[in-house]
C-alpha cells in the first residue's frame, strides 16, 4: 500500500477547506428596502402667459405652453408641459356667455371629471379658496394611484370658466412621484393666484 507524502495531504486538506468555505458563503438574498430615484427639482421661477387668450397667469420657466391638439379642444385650451418631469397641466377655458345652462354644464363636467377618479382614489379633498385677485376657486387634491393628483376650477359665473388638472405621462407610482407632484402643485397654486381675465 502506497502512502502519500505528508506535505501533499496537508495541501489537499487546505484546498478542500478553502473550497468548502467558499461554498458556504452563499450570496445574501435578503430583500432590500424599496428605494426611489433621486429627483433634483429646480427652483420655482415664473413668466407671464402671452396676451393671446382671454386670460393670463404666471407659469413655470421649466414648462412649455402648447396648444391642446385633441379633437375636442377649443381655441383657448392649453397644455403647460414640463418636459423634464413628464408632467402636464391641462387647461380648459370656456366663455359661458352669460348662459346659465352652459355654466351649469361646465360645473357638472368639472365635478364629473374629478369624480371619475373615485375608483382609484384613496381620498378626494375639496377646498374653496379665495385668490389674491378676488376669485373664488374649488381646489381638489386626490390621493392614491389616480391619473390626476391635483385640479382646480374657477369661474365668475357670468362669462369665464377656467379649469386646470395635473397629469403625468409616466407609469411611475404616485408615491415615488410625490416630490414632483408637490413641485407642480406649488406652480399650479401660483398659476391660480396670478390668474386674471383680460377680455
Residue ranges and their predicted role:
Residues 53-108:
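Secretory pathway targeting signatures of secreted, lumenal, and periplasmic proteins
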Residues 19-22:
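C-terminal motif of bacterial Sec signal peptides marking the signal peptidase cleavage site
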Residues 1-12:
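Bacterial N-terminal signal peptides that target proteins for export
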Residues 24-27:
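Bacterial signal peptide processing site
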Amino acid at each position: 500500500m502506497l502512502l502519500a507524502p505528508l506535505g501533499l495531504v496537508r495541501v489537499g486538506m487546505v484546498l478542500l477547506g478553502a473550497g468548502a468555505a467558499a461554498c458556504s458563503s452563499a450570496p445574501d438574498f435578503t430583500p432590500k428596502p424599496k428605494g426611489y430615484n433621486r429627483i433634483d427639482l429646480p427652483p420655482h421661477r415664473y413668466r407671464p402667459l402671452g396676451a393671446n387668450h382671454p386670460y393670463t397667469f404666471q407659469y413655470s420657466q421649466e414648462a412649455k405652453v402648447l396648444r391642446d391638439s385633441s379633437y375636442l379642444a377649443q381655441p383657448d385650451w392649453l397644455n403647460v408641459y414640463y418636459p423634464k418631469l413628464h408632467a402636464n397641466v391641462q387647461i380648459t377655458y370656456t366663455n359661458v356667455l352669460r348662459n346659465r345652462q352652459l355654466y351649469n354644464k361646465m360645473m357638472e363636467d368639472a365635478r364629473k371629471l374629478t369624480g371619475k377618479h373615485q375608483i382609484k382614489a384613496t381620498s378626494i379633498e375639496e377646498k374653496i379658496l379665495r385668490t389674491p385677485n378676488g376669485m373664488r376657486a374649488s381646489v381638489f387634491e386626490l390621493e392614491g394611484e389616480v391619473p390626476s393628483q391635483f385640479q382646480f376650477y374657477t369661474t365668475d359665473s357670468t362669462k369665464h370658466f377656467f379649469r386646470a388638472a395635473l397629469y403625468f405621462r409616466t407609469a411611475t407610482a404616485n408615491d415615488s412621484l410625490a416630490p414632483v407632484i408637490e413641485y407642480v402643485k406649488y406652480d399650479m397654486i401660483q398659476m391660480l393666484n396670478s390668474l386674471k381675465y383680460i377680455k
